[in-house]
Amino acid sequence: MDLKLKDCEFWYSLHGQVPGLLDWDMRNELFLPCTTDQCSLAEQILAKYRVGVMKPPEMPQKRRPSPDGDGPPCEPNLWMWVDPNILCPLGSQEAPKPSGKEDLTNISPFPQPPQKDEGSNCSEDKVVESLPSSSSEQSPLQKQGIHSPSDFELTEEEAEEPDDNSLQSPEMKCYQSQKLWQINNQEKSWQRPPLNCSHLIALALRNNPHCGLSVQEIYNFTRQHFPFFWTAPDGWKSTIHYNLCFLDSFEKVPDSLKDEDNARPRSCLWKLTKEGHRRFWEETRVLAFAQRERIQECMSQPELLTSLFDL
């Protein structure tokens, strides 16, 4: 959504303040764009409890000077108004308004080795400061963007070593695969595919077994075949969850697999309905045929387009 405001200066002046919204039901607001059905029941209850115990700040808030001179004069909280262009500028790895001598425009996510030893520490600090920071969840590439290329020299060798499931955690496996993916794709800028979220969901469900997929598995499928979503803002996840809940092309089915510890359903899965299969054949495949070249440019493996879309 692109809002065009007449009095922009007034709204910009509210950055870092709590002028209103104290009567806002933040508990319900936070869970509207969130997906928790892929989590265990205990984790869902704990997340709702943590939000439920939060209370809005008392007014008026006590102003205090920021220690670093860059933060707001009040204690940060969920009810604070902020300018997202200042907190997390999109499409740029630089600060929105750098000072005169500290222009970070040409600094890349991977720092180059300095010519002099004296400026090594200063160079690293500038690179870290140039990365956008946010309280929301960052993508894997953003989290690992401050590493130097030398950190990834042995990644391919590590990936080829046999995995011991008893010694290696799932988080470690995921981390290694993401590092390897980053090496192969760090120099390429991916474009957004000409497909909406309902097409992406149908594509993921159509190319997986009939038992269905969880929400997290749909996310993983989308990022695996369309790398644009590795670095895209997390809003696309909320759109996928919205489409799953409100379109008649998808239905939720209970997972038949049981957890061995407490014998409960692991999570809910999603499947294509008859209407979903019809739309895949009449809409998604037709769009893929018409936009074949553009879609292939956005895919990590363009040769799979024919099999994925059943062309």
Curated annotation (Swiss-Prot):
Tissue occurrence: Expressed in breast cancer cell lines and primary cancer.
One MF term in the entry's GO annotations: DNA-binding transcription factor activity, RNA polymerase II-specific
Record has DNA-binding as a keyword: yes
Localization: Nucleus
DNA-binding feature ranges: 192-294
Entry superkingdom: Eukaryota
Acidic residues bias locations: 153-164
Positions of region (Disordered): 56-76, 90-171
Keywords: DNA-binding, Nucleus, Transcription, Transcription regulation
Transmembrane segments: none
Listed Low complexity bias regions: 129-143
Primary location class: nucleus
The keyword Manganese belongs to this UniProt entry's keyword annotation: no
Cited SUPFAM superfamilies: Winged helix' DNA-binding domain
Regions of compositional bias (Basic and acidic residues) in chain numbering: 115-128
InterPro entries, per the entry: Fork_head_dom, FOX_transcription_regulators, WH-like_DNA-bd_sf, WH_DNA-bd_sf
A cellular-component GO term for this protein: nucleus
Pfam families the record matches: Forkhead (PF00250)
Protein name stated in the entry: Forkhead box protein R2
Species whose genome carries this gene: Homo sapiens
